């Protein structure tokens, strides 16, 4: 990302007096000011720009389900167009790859994606019942998975997540579990079963991994977030059904920032909620509608860890929206 882009994302804040350590942390470490030490409850994320509409052309979407950010580029899983599209941070189209089909590099509903630390891209190829791995320019590397309930098989693979050791965590809505693989698809273990108890899941949508290796799962059907160790031991949970702060109606997408704060797309409440890694509510943004900053059935969310910019897959509006934190 260029210096000009970083400056635009970093410094469009109100004129306030801040402790010097917060300013230093923001300038040197790249932490968003509001999340690092902000106590102003009126501060939140504000709309910056948007792009996309319903269609098949470059920059158009049909049910885009997920979004991620890596090395100055925005990657979007364009679900019903069976492809991935790549943009610059402000929505200028760069490239695309994929088409409908069953061959290597083809998709039958590209439902979700994630990036590893080396820039490789993992796509949940939903109705081909597999994960496909690509370079970040769309070159096919490998694939794994088939239809079924056995180890390494899928019925409804959803958002994969990567840890610092190269392991990949894949949620499966219909199997109500999380499967763990090496970065080339070798099955390691799995955990989870259908239910409402601690460690049980109901239609899990996505997962994310923090800097300590803990795994967070959007437990969609139970309207909560669950936190696990990376070998599947239950740590904590938060949320229940409702519209208040910290409650959910269909938590779907997850992302994480440089401070291990967790971003959740609260799909049927048409908003994004932000929490600490132990589930303490920080802020929220979004409301129902099609105007700037409004959302309809948002699914995916991605955070640029350097600038703190937040990208939301505003699925019902067939667009991506960019937000930044402002005081």
What do these predicted ranges mean?
Residues 36-327:
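Eukaryotic scaffold repeat domains enriched in small/polar residues
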Residues 28-38:
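Signal peptide processing junction and immediate N-terminal pro/mature segment
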Residues 1-11:
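N-terminal secretory signal peptides that target proteins for export/translocation
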Residues 17-30:
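Bacterial N-terminal signal peptides
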């Amino acid at each position: 990302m260029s210096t000009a882009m970083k400056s635009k994302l970093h410094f469009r804040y109100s004129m306030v007096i801040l402790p010097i350590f917060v300013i230093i942390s923001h300038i040197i470490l790249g932490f968003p000011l509001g999340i690092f030490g902000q106590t102003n409850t009126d501060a939140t994320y504000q709309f910056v720009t948007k792009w996309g509409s319903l269609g098949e052309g470059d920059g158009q979407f049909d049910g885009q389900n997920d979004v991620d950010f890596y090395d100055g580029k925005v990657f979007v899983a364009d679900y019903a167009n069976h492809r991935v599209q790549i943009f610059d941070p402000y929505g200028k189209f760069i490239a695309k790859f994929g088409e409908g089909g069953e061959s290597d590099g083809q998709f039958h509903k590209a439902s979700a994606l994630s990036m590893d630390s080396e820039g490789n891209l993992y796509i949940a190829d939903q109705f081909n019942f597999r994960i496909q791995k690509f370079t970040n320019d769309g070159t096919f590397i490998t694939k794994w998975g088939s239809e079924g309930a056995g180890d390494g098989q899928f019925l409804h693979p959803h958002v994969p997540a990567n840890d610092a050791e190269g392991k990949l965590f894949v949620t499966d809505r219909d199997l109500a579990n999380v499967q763990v693989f090496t970065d080339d698809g070798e099955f390691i273990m799995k955990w989870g079963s259908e239910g409402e108890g601690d460690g049980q899941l109901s239609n899990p949508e996505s997962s994310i991994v923090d800097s300590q290796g803990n795994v967070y799962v959007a437990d969609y059907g139970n309207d909560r977030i669950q936190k696990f160790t990376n070998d599947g031991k239950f740590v904590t949970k938060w949320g229940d059904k409702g519209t208040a702060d910290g409650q959910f109606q269909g938590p779907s997408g997850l992302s994480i920032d440089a401070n291990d704060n967790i971003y959740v797309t609260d799909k049927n409440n048409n908003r994004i909620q932000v929490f600490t890694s132990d589930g303490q509510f920080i802020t929220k943004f979004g409301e129902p509608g099609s105007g700037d900053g409004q959302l309809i059935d948002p699914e995916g969310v991605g955070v640029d860890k350097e600038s703190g910019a937040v990208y939301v897959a505003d699925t019902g509006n067939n667009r991506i929206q960019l937000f930044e934190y402002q005081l």
